[in-house]
Amino acid sequence: RRSRLGVLFKLLCLAALVAALTFGATVFFQVETIAVTGDSRYTQDEIIAASGVQVGDNLFRMNKKQISQEILHQLPYVESVSILRGLPSTITFQVTEWDAVAQVEVYAQGQTEESGEEGESQQAAAKEAWLISVGGKLLEPVSASHTAPISVTGLTALAPEAGSMLAVPQDQQSKLTALTNVLEQLQQQGMISRVSSVDLTHVSCMVLRLDGSIDAKLPLTGDTAYYLRALNAAVEEENRRRGGQAVGTMDLTQKEYTAIFTPAESGG
């Protein structure tokens, strides 16, 4: 009987301790300071408002994942948010942002809406060009003051909404994958500023306008990183051979050769 009483006493003490800690966390760890760090096109007030966090909220009862998702959804240019608790009463949002690297132009050809299993036609094609991030996140419509360095043709954006991912008809999915792959590799290899357009209107290849003088034909599938390295090397070699900037087409879609250069015809 004494043993049972001892166990019961310990359990009661443990429950009291948990209750005390919970009460203490509720009373003493309330948000008094909200800070935002990182370069941002959004103001501190905009980021805090999107988070939904308010002074007086409990530091340990907030759902950090849900808060991050709210910020990412409401503020399209935000790439990631780290939420840091600083005892006793500070919460800090560390924000990184996407750059608008490309703009998806209006494309009228191809499938412009999809139908559900019961025949509902649902997703309308975009009627204006949209800015996207490297990963294909829709940022905002193109305007006179907001543009991107790379123009993309050959994709039909469906039901675009800022903060969502670029969606296209099923028959363009492989081209969308090719686009995000090439944008990622262009960024990693420091080539974004050298490319002015990506043409995805062709069936089996994409065409990049490079350095304002080279139309580079790349396969839609395969090792995009390798193709870009090979392209860069081939263009450098052609420029050296000609003693200046080469003008023409560089074809990397032929199995027999790494790259084939065809000079542009001179007008005359």
Regions found by a protein language model. Give the residues of each.
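Charged, solvent-exposed interaction patches on well-folded alpha/beta domains
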Residues: 1-18, 23, 56, 80-268
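Aromatic-capped interface at the extracytoplasmic side
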Residues: 18-39
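Preference for short coil/turn "hinge" residues that link or interrupt alpha-helices
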Residues: 22-24, 35, 46, 52-55, ...
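Conserved short hydrophobic interaction patches
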Residues: 50, 74, 234-238
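Short extracytoplasmic
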Residues: 40-73
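Structural recognition of beta-strand segments within beta-rich domains
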Residues: 73-75, 83
